[in-house]
Amino acid sequence: MHWKYSKKPNPKKHFGFVYLITNKKTDKAYVGCKQYWHPVKRKKGSTAPTKRESNWLIYMGSSKSLLEDIKKLGKRSFKFEIIAEFKNKRSLKYYELYYQMKYNVLSSVLEGTDEAAYYNNYVGGKFYRPVQEFEDEPTKYK
């Protein structure tokens, strides 16, 4: 398992975790969340389990550019840290967004450069990294 955490992860007691993946060479990072369990649709009358364990042990994030860098530089060039675990989906999603806002993932830049400090290109599925910088007042139409 590549995840580092101040204590042992506890999938039986928690729904998922918020994580930080950091490129050790550039300090560029990614903040995301991962569920320990996924619901399984049961056939009527079945006694099969209602959830199955996710791929959290080997999971390396969902950002395309992060995954490309991991493939190019190797997994050892990255630090995989669990920030905190949460007992339900609502708390998990809330704190994922909380940490993304806390770290200012959409507008932070690497020190001394204009390169984004985070691999995150959007948060909450609604707010995206700007494609261009806002330079002037919007044009007023009559």
Q: Predicted regions: what is each one?
A:
Residues 1-141:
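Structure-specific nucleic-acid interaction/processing domains
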